[in-house]
Amino acid sequence: MASPDEDGRPSLPNPWDAILEAVKHQLPSLDSDSSASDCEDEELFIFQRNQTVLIPDLSEELADDPAGAWVTSSGSPPGLAAVPVESAMEPWGEWNAWPRPKESAPLEGRAPSKSSSLLRMSAETPPRQDDDAGGTLNTSASQSPRQGPQGEATRSPQEAGLQTEPLGAASQAQEGSDAASRKALRRERRKMIEKDILHKVTWDGRNPACPDASRGKEKACDAVEVPSEGPPGCLPVLSLQELEEWDLDQVLLSLTGREEDRGDGAPGAAWWAAGRLQGQDHTEPSTQDRLMERLSLLCARQSRETCRAQPGYGTARERVGSSSSSGHLGRRPLGLSCPPARVLSVRRLRPLEIRPGPALG
């Protein structure tokens, strides 16, 4: 089959023989039924059979191949079929595609180990060349500007970042200026509130154009200043210190008097001072007198309604009530426009006593 080499190993013309030689002891026989532990001659004879018997006969299946890649000879015994050159060199297809070096050309006279090592080396070299070529292509592509679909050069991410930095700095500067303007507006508002609003309710911040400001401070009775007829822009100045000294009861009574005021008495601006000033001549009745008058009118109205429901009350009593009401209204001030009311006396008239006369005979 082959002549022995210098090292004592048979030289194989085909690499498939080397592969079969390596895996020969791992392929079992088709008719091996007994275990390998038996040491009989029959078992030894099974493993000493011909090499072609160890591989199943696939000639019939390969003959049905339409491509006709596998060719079998009619006179050859059933065994290994003839293998075409392209399929035999299939494991080394990548190596065949590259230019074959001069040293690896004659492989027929070398041992399988040497040929396999050379094949491994030659198979490993092309990817390195691919990597080198890819690296050169990548470096050249990175150096040259990228072009878009229309031939325009697109900018790299670094250039885009350099261009976006000035935009970001401008936006930050604009935000900083906006924040500074907001702070300035807030400060101006605080100053305006402190000067224009808070100083108006204190005596130190009153308007000097108001002529009665100093006079009101001296002549104020208990709490507030009486606004006089001054310039229209002069506003009443209040003091927080004097607001705490106000008499709430007196303020409530003065409010009730203000509701009844119609303009004939004291002026509307000084409605609260009319009832509080003592020792001065004034024609307006006090608040207590007004309240008592209203109570008397209410009682008279209710009594009149009850008296009308009772029989026996004639026109004389109405006359008495009208006379008493007219006399009472004479004491009322003319400034109050209240409807006239009739006041009836609560005293009841005694019923007439009828004495029986002497009996006639």
Swiss-Prot record:
Q: Where is the composition biased (Low complexity)?
A: 321-334
Disulphide-bonded residues: none
- Give the Phosphoserine positions (modified residues): S142, S144
An example Gene Ontology biological process = outer dynein arm assembly
Single Gene Ontology MF annotation: dynein complex binding
What does the UniProt keyword field contain? Cytoplasm, Phosphoprotein
| Region feature (Disordered) | 65-191, 309-334
Q: What is its main location?
A: other
Where does this polypeptide localize? Dynein axonemal particle; Cytoplasm
**Would you tell me the Gene Ontology cellular component terms?**
cytoplasm; dynein axonemal particle
Compositional bias per record (Polar residues), positions renumbered to this chain: 136-157
Please list every transmembrane segment annotated in the UniProt record, as residue ranges.
none
Q: Which residues form a coiled coil?
A: none
Query: InterPro entries, from UniProt?
Result: DNAAF8 (IPR031531)
Alphabetized Pfam families for the sequence: DAAP1 (PF15773)
| Functional summary from the UniProt entry | In cyliated cells, dynein axonemal particle-specific protein required for deployment of ODA to the axoneme. Interacts with outer dynein arm (ODA) subunits.
Which PANTHER family does the UniProt record give? Answer: CHROMOSOME 16 OPEN READING FRAME 71 (PTHR35977), DYNEIN AXONEMAL ASSEMBLY FACTOR 8 (PTHR35977:SF1)
Q: What is this protein called?
A: Dynein axonemal assembly factor 8
Q: Which organism is it from?
A: Bos taurus
